[in-house]
């Protein structure tokens, strides 16, 4: 699978969750958005070419302490089969980082089909 990933969070510069295990946000929570624009690839025989999706996540404290909540957003053109494949990836049930570690720490509380727009490139990107 190839594509581009985007990650935004409420931590101060140098996300403590990724580097130290604990959020360094002002309120001690971990809130963020992880977005993907899959250029090409498959999961279980399902083509994911062109899929845009995002996980809007929140943990009350450190990620590894659990109790996280997640809402997934997919572009309206995403099929039910693609959504099922993405659910397997993001839940961590297929293995592979980071979702093998993140999936068990959060509960999915919703799925939304909304238009996802990506603008710019590199550090000037918006999602």
Predicted regions and their residues:
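Internal, well-folded beta-alpha domain core
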Residues: 50-127
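N-terminal ordered "arm"
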Residues: 1-41
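Generic detector of intrinsically disordered, low-complexity, polar/charged segments
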Residues: 13, 25, 29, 41, ...
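Short, intrinsically disordered, low-complexity segments enriched in Ser/Thr and Pro
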Residues: 32-58
């Amino acid at each position: 699978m190839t594509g581009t990933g985007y990650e935004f969070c409420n931590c101060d510069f140098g996300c403590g969750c990724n580097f130290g295990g604990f959020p360094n946000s002002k309120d001690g929570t971990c809130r963020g958005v992880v977005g993907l624009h899959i250029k090409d690839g498959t999961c279980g025989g399902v083509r994911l070419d062109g899929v845009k999706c995002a996980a809007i996540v929140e943990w009350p404290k450190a990620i590894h302490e659990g109790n996280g909540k997640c809402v997934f957003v997919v572009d309206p053109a995403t099929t039910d089969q693609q959504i099922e494949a993405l659910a397997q990836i993001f839940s961590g049930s297929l293995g592979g980082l980071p979702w093998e570690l993140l999936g068990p720490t959060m509960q999915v509380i919703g799925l939304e089909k909304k238009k996802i727009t990506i603008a710019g490139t590199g550090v000037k990107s918006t999602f």
